[in-house]
Amino acid sequence: MQALVLLLCIGALLGHSSCQNPASPPEEGSPDPDSTGALVEEEDPFFKVPVNKLAAAVSNFGYDLYRVRSSTSPTTNVLLSPLSVATALSALSLGAEQRTESIIHRALYYDLISSPDIHGTYKELLDTVTAPQKNLKSASRIVFEKKLRIKSSFVAPLEKSYGTRPRVLTGNPRLDLQEINNWVQAQMKGKLARSTKEIPDEISILLLGVAHFKGQWVTKFDSRKTSLEDFYLDEERTVRVPMMSDPKAVLRYGLDSDLSCKIAQLPLTGSMSIIFFLPLKVTQNLTLIEESLTSEFIHDIDRELKTVQAVLTVPKLKLSYEGEVTKSLQEMKLQSLFDSPDFSKITGKPIKLTQVEHRAGFEWNEDGAGTTPSPGLQPAHLTFPLDYHLNQPFIFVLRDTDTGALLFIGKILDPRGP
């Protein structure tokens, strides 16, 4: 796990430093050495909670998926809700025999979890992150080729743990598309546009993951302060976009010298937050930051950032994505699911994964719960002004505070979209 090095500039003002002399004796409560004399790091208590451990696993899958998608889209925005894709894969693993199941489980990092009831814990995770106050809508579905006979022993646990039933295609492309669109509309409460892409004839197994989120800040922005301002696409090009501003924003902040970026965290209602990664220089190459993203690293950030007051500007954002993540998953050691998997717990007929579709919508504007910061946020007193302007390419992570789950991730090179 990458160590988080936060050169906060305010550390000295806070009267302490997190750096320690390597020659100093270990403090009380520090890890004990093993038989070789090496320090053995104890697992963070946060990750000892089964649902948090599972959330970390599927989130690490999500960061992997994001990295693959971003590497194939170096000059365009990337928007993903990896949880919905992970949920579809996890649900599909219920119908896999051991060889195929282990392939899916390794991709989802389940091989690092000792929980005997992963699917039961997944239900707890879904119930937590899709609670009404979270403002997150997320759903997944498994669609099978026409006339396939599905075993009831697969359907029952699928419905119990994942709250969904499989769909068998009729063979009529127009009716199948209409039915899937109707399902998406029902799950997303009409927040996502209907797809016009026909279902391919050669479908054997289609996985569908959909999600929508409209954030509500704990402290709303004053819409009267929103104005058109420059957003730097790169060192030479700018565009004018609506920018929200708060001259006295209370946020959590840190400067990571290893990643050459400024990190800020803004709280949302429903026990959620958005973490922003803003490079020190204008660039569309965010690879250094992207390679560092793991559940453990984000958890460390959440613990280490300091509450400050800053001049903040954030672009209004409304993005959507509709497309396949099939090729991305094939690059993530899941190719065998598309070749010769064993899904004999689903049906007696040989079937394989042929397509994975993802639809997502994400939005934030000035809306918030109140006009003053949370009473629990006491900013450090700074002797210099601190600015945090999201007026150049950046990465954001939408994280559930209760479980640590990655819910959305985006690379914003141009706030205008798509």
UniProtKB/Swiss-Prot annotation:
<dbReference type="GO" id="GO:0010596">
    <property type="term" value="P:negative regulation of endothelial cell migration"/>
</dbReference>
<dbReference type="InterPro" id="IPR036186">
    <property type="entry name" value="Serpin_sf"/>
</dbReference>
<protein>
    <recommendedName>
        <fullName>Pigment epithelium-derived factor</fullName>
    </recommendedName>
</protein>
<dbReference type="GO" id="GO:0043203">
    <property type="term" value="C:axon hillock"/>
</dbReference>
<keyword id="KW-0964">Secreted</keyword>
<dbReference type="GO" id="GO:0007614">
    <property type="term" value="P:short-term memory"/>
</dbReference>
<comment type="similarity">
    <text>Belongs to the serpin family.</text>
</comment>
<dbReference type="GO" id="GO:0005604">
    <property type="term" value="C:basement membrane"/>
</dbReference>
<dbReference type="GO" id="GO:0048471">
    <property type="term" value="C:perinuclear region of cytoplasm"/>
</dbReference>
<dbReference type="InterPro" id="IPR033832">
    <property type="entry name" value="PEDF_serpin_dom"/>
</dbReference>
<dbReference type="GO" id="GO:0001822">
    <property type="term" value="P:kidney development"/>
</dbReference>
<feature type="modified residue" description="Phosphoserine; by CK2">
    <location>
        <position position="24"/>
    </location>
</feature>
<feature type="signal peptide">
    <location>
        <begin position="1"/>
        <end position="19"/>
    </location>
</feature>
<dbReference type="GO" id="GO:0050769">
    <property type="term" value="P:positive regulation of neurogenesis"/>
</dbReference>
<feature type="modified residue" description="Phosphoserine; by PKA">
    <location>
        <position position="227"/>
    </location>
</feature>
<feature type="region of interest" description="Disordered">
    <location>
        <begin position="20"/>
        <end position="39"/>
    </location>
</feature>
<dbReference type="GO" id="GO:0042470">
    <property type="term" value="C:melanosome"/>
</dbReference>
<dbReference type="GO" id="GO:0070062">
    <property type="term" value="C:extracellular exosome"/>
</dbReference>
<keyword id="KW-0732">Signal</keyword>
<dbReference type="GO" id="GO:0060767">
    <property type="term" value="P:epithelial cell proliferation involved in prostate gland development"/>
</dbReference>
<dbReference type="GO" id="GO:0062023">
    <property type="term" value="C:collagen-containing extracellular matrix"/>
</dbReference>
<comment type="subunit">
    <text>Interacts with PNPLA2; this interaction stimulates the phospholipase A2 activity of PNPLA2.</text>
</comment>
<dbReference type="InterPro" id="IPR023795">
    <property type="entry name" value="Serpin_CS"/>
</dbReference>
<dbReference type="GO" id="GO:0010447">
    <property type="term" value="P:response to acidic pH"/>
</dbReference>
<dbReference type="GO" id="GO:0060041">
    <property type="term" value="P:retina development in camera-type eye"/>
</dbReference>
<keyword id="KW-0597">Phosphoprotein</keyword>
<dbReference type="GO" id="GO:1901652">
    <property type="term" value="P:response to peptide"/>
</dbReference>
<dbReference type="GO" id="GO:0060770">
    <property type="term" value="P:negative regulation of epithelial cell proliferation involved in prostate gland development"/>
</dbReference>
<feature type="region of interest" description="O-glycosylated at one site">
    <location>
        <begin position="371"/>
        <end position="383"/>
    </location>
</feature>
<dbReference type="GO" id="GO:0010976">
    <property type="term" value="P:positive regulation of neuron projection development"/>
</dbReference>
<dbReference type="InterPro" id="IPR042185">
    <property type="entry name" value="Serpin_sf_2"/>
</dbReference>
<keyword id="KW-1065">Osteogenesis imperfecta</keyword>
<keyword id="KW-0325">Glycoprotein</keyword>
<dbReference type="GO" id="GO:0016525">
    <property type="term" value="P:negative regulation of angiogenesis"/>
</dbReference>
<dbReference type="InterPro" id="IPR023796">
    <property type="entry name" value="Serpin_dom"/>
</dbReference>
<feature type="modified residue" description="Pyrrolidone carboxylic acid">
    <location>
        <position position="20"/>
    </location>
</feature>
<dbReference type="GO" id="GO:0071333">
    <property type="term" value="P:cellular response to glucose stimulus"/>
</dbReference>
<dbReference type="InterPro" id="IPR000215">
    <property type="entry name" value="Serpin_fam"/>
</dbReference>
<keyword id="KW-0873">Pyrrolidone carboxylic acid</keyword>
<dbReference type="GO" id="GO:0005576">
    <property type="term" value="C:extracellular region"/>
</dbReference>
<dbReference type="InterPro" id="IPR042178">
    <property type="entry name" value="Serpin_sf_1"/>
</dbReference>
<dbReference type="GO" id="GO:0071300">
    <property type="term" value="P:cellular response to retinoic acid"/>
</dbReference>
